[in-house]
Amino acid sequence: MLLYLADVVIFSHAKVYMEKIEKKNNSLKKFHIKTYGCQMNVYDSEMIEKIVSGLGFTLSERAEDADLIILNTCNIREKAAEKLYSELGQIRLLQKKKQERILIVVAGCVAQAEGEEIMRRAENVDVVVGPQSIHSLPELIAKVNRQSGKAIKMEFDPIEKFDYLAEETRKRRVPQSSAFLSIQEGCDKFCAFCVVPYTRGAEYSRSTEEVYREALSLTTKGVKEITLLGQNVNGYHGTLDSGNKVLNLGQLISRLGKIPSLKRIRYTTSHPVDMHKELYDAHANESKLMPFVHLPVQSGSDKILKQMNRKYTTADYLKIINEFQNARSDIAFSSDFIVGFPGESDDDFQQTLALIEQVNYAQCYSFKYSPRPGTPGATYPQISEETKNTRLQKLQQLLKEKQLEFNKKMIGKTVTVLFDKKHPDKISGRTEYMQQVFSDDSNLLDKIVTMRVEDASTFTLKCTAEDIIST
C-alpha cells in the first residue's frame, strides 16, 4: 500500500486542528452518519467512520447528540435529491433547537450529481464530497473550521480513494462476523436508466494483493464471510503487485479461498456481459464460494433490453444461467427487474413474467422505472404511473410466489447458517441462499451452524440446529 507524505500531513493537520477546537470549545466531539442505498455505500460509510474517528470524533447513534452529521447518499431511485433536501430541512430544525453549530457533510452519489447546487439550496451544508473523494474529509473538515466557509470536492480518482488513504483509515471497525470488501468501482456500461457511470465514474479495480491483504486483515478480526463488492464486480481485473499479471474475479476468488480462517465468499453485483470461464470454475471448485449468484436481467424482453443498452439478449442470459448450473447443480439465482421502462408494451411485460417462470429465482428485487436526470431513458416518452404501478404489483406477486416455492423446497434439507446479527431477544443469520433464519440460542452468534429446515415462509426458514461447523 502506498503511503504519501502529503496525505499524512493533511490527516495530521486536520487532527491537530480538531484537538485545538476541542480544547477551546468542548463541543466538536460526536458524529452521526446516515447511510442510504447499496452495499457499496455501507462500505464507504465504514471508511468514513474510521476517517472521522481518526480526527477525534466518537460515533453517535443519534443525530440529536452529534456535532457532525454525515449523510452518505444514493442517487439510484427517483427523487433522491428531494429526499436529501427534506432530510437537511429536518437537520436545520435540529440546529435551531440546539442553538449550536452542527457541521453538515453530504457525501455519496447525490453529492456527486448535485455538487454546488446542494449548498445553494441548503445553506446549512458545510461540506459536499463525492464517493471517490471521501479520503479528503480530514482536509475538507479542517478547511471549513479554519476558514468558517464551505468545502467541496468531487474528483473521480478511485486510485486516491483506495491507495492514498493513510494506513489508519484502513483499520476497520468490524463488529460482526461478515463484512463487505470493495474490489471494484464505477461502470462503463452506460445503461439507459442508470446514473452510476456519472456518479461513480469509470470502472476501476483494486490490485489483487491489496484486496488479499484487506481480506486477511478482516479475518484476523473474526470475519468469517466476505462479500466482494463492485458496481460491476465480475468486470474486476486487478493486477498483482508486480503489475505484470491481471486476475479476473474467478481467479481472485480462488486466491482468497486459500485464506484458512475465511469460511464463506460472496460477490455482488454482476453484469451478464462480463461473465468468464474462471468464474464458472470457481463455483465448481471453490467450496467457500456460496452457491448463490445475483445476476440482474432487468427485463425479459429483447426489445427493452436493447432500449436499455444492456448489450445482451434473453438467450444470452439463459446461456449464462445454464453455465452456472453446469458448474454447480445446487446453485440459485436472484435478480433485479425494472417495469415500465419507456417503450415497454404489455407483451414485453409478459415476456418478463415468462422469464421469471423459466429461471425460478430464489429471490428478486423489483422497481418501477424512474427517470434519472442526465440519462438517455429520461429523454424517452414515458409510460404512465398507473401502468407502472399495475405491472409492478403483478411482478411482485409472482416473485413472492416463486420465492416461497423455492423456500418450501428446502423443507427437510440441511443448510448452513452464519449467525451474524443480534436482536433484542434473538439472533439471526443467513443460509447459503441468503434466506434469513432466527434462533433463540445466543451462543450461536458468530458461528456457522448446520441446520435442518422444518418450515418455510416467503422470507424466512424455521430450522433446528444440528451441528456447529465453525466457531
Curated annotation (Swiss-Prot):
Signal peptide: none
Cofactor note: Binds 2 [4Fe-4S] clusters. One cluster is coordinated with 3 cysteines and an exchangeable S-adenosyl-L-methionine.
Keywords: 4Fe-4S, Cytoplasm, Iron, Iron-sulfur, Metal-binding, S-adenosyl-L-methionine, Transferase, tRNA processing
Residues holding [4Fe-4S] cluster 1: 38, 74, 109
List of residues binding [4Fe-4S] cluster 2: 187, 191, 194
Ranges of residues in domain MTTase N-terminal: 29-146
Catalytic activity: N(6)-dimethylallyladenosine(37) in tRNA + (sulfur carrier)-SH + AH2 + 2 S-adenosyl-L-methionine = 2-methylsulfanyl-N(6)-dimethylallyladenosine(37) in tRNA + (sulfur carrier)-H + 5'-deoxyadenosine + L-methionine + A + S-adenosyl-L-homocysteine + 2 H(+)
TRAM domain sequence ranges: 408-467
Residue ranges occupied by any Radical SAM core domain in the UniProt entry: 173-405
Cofactors that this protein relies on: [4Fe-4S] cluster
InterPro entries with a match to the protein in the record: Elp3/MiaA/NifB-like_rSAM (IPR006638), Methylthiotransferase (IPR005839), Methylthiotransferase_CS (IPR020612), Methylthiotransferase_N (IPR013848), Methylthiotransferase_N_sf (IPR038135), MiaB_methiolase (IPR006463), rSAM (IPR007197), rSAM_horseshoe (IPR023404)
Enzyme Commission number(s) from the entry: 2.8.4.3
Transmembrane segments: none
Similarity annotation: Belongs to the methylthiotransferase family. MiaB subfamily.
Cited function: Catalyzes the methylthiolation of N6-(dimethylallyl)adenosine (i(6)A), leading to the formation of 2-methylthio-N6-(dimethylallyl)adenosine (ms(2)i(6)A) at position 37 in tRNAs that read codons beginning with uridine.
Descriptive protein name: tRNA-2-methylthio-N(6)-dimethylallyladenosine synthase
